[in-house]
Every structure is written in structure tokens, then in C-alpha cells.
Amino acid sequence: MSLPKCDPVYKATIIPRGGALGMVVSLPEMDRLNYHKDEAKQKITMTMAGKAAEIIKYGEEGVSNGPAGDIQQASALARAMVMRWGMSDKVGAVDYAEAHEGYSGNTGGFSVSAKTKEMIEEEVRELIEEGYQEARRILIEKEEQFERLAKGLLEYETLTGEEIGKVIRGEALGGDDDTPPSAIPSVPAIPRVPPAGQAPVPTA
């Protein structure tokens, strides 16, 4: 919706599953063979939305470990962009992935200098921070729509992509979705369900 380069949302649920307190499942419209830079950056934004939503709703001190999986996913994608895919102007089109194991800088005869290691980390952090700030901007800008989504998830627990569209537009749903949560691996986890009386925080 706000991130057109991301895969369409197939389903969102606040039902705990597989160690996650909820999940958003995205499915590509066709088999993906490659990533473009703008697509990868938007996926990082989508992945960081859970953490951004928690901070907006509960403040810096109210953030939980709920978005931990999202942060790991965003970090892995940002590292791939910088270290393997040549998507950093500063680092250049060099594959540093082989030297990443343990970040010792000396793996299989391939060395990475301290300066290069620091530059890689700076680029990875910059990509993640940029994604976080963009997710935060979207959530604040579209506060009304995402409050509707939060209430819809609280009421129905699981929503399909089509139902999510209806909910954020303020349209009534035809009936409950009794389909159990998909077993497909998730993209970002929805943050923890807050204490009674508070609405859950949706992701972008």
C-alpha cells in the first residue's frame, strides 16, 4: 500500500505462532530471481515497521523484544546489499560476504581491514536507520488508517490482504475469516499485544 515495491500482503494475524506474537505474510506475485536496490530498501522499511510502531505507541522505554526477528531480517538484507550485491557506493562492487564469518577479517585467506569493516558497518546501519525512519514517517502520516487496522486485528485476529484493504478504507467486512494462520514464513512480526484496554500496533 505505502511501499509499492514490496510483495503484496497475503495475511496478517495477531495469533501467536512459532515464537512470534503475530505475523504479516507477504507473497510475491511471481517467482523472484533478483532484487533491485529500491525493492530491497522498501523491504527493509517494511521490516522495521514493527519497531517503529512500538516506539510511536509506547515510547522508547516501552519497546519490547517483539521486533527482534524483524531486526535480524533487516540486518541480513542490509548486509547482503552492502557486502554481496554491490549496492553501496562507498563499499563498491566487491563481494565481502566470504569474510563475514565471525567478522574476524580473516576467513579462507581473505582479509578485511579494520577500515573496511567499519565502513561496511556504517553502511549497514545507515540502510537500517533509513528504513526505520521511513517506516516511522508512514505510520505517523497514515495514523488513522493504521488505527483502523489495529482495531480490525483486535476484533478478527486474522485478516487477509483483501480484508486489510477494506478495513483501512473503513469498509465493513462481509464476515469473519476463520482460516487458520498460514504456515508460510513471515515478513515482519506484528508487535506484542499491549495490555488490556490498549489497541495493538500495526505495521506499515
Q: Where is each model-derived feature located?
A:
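Soluble catalytic regions of large protease machineries
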Residues: 1-204
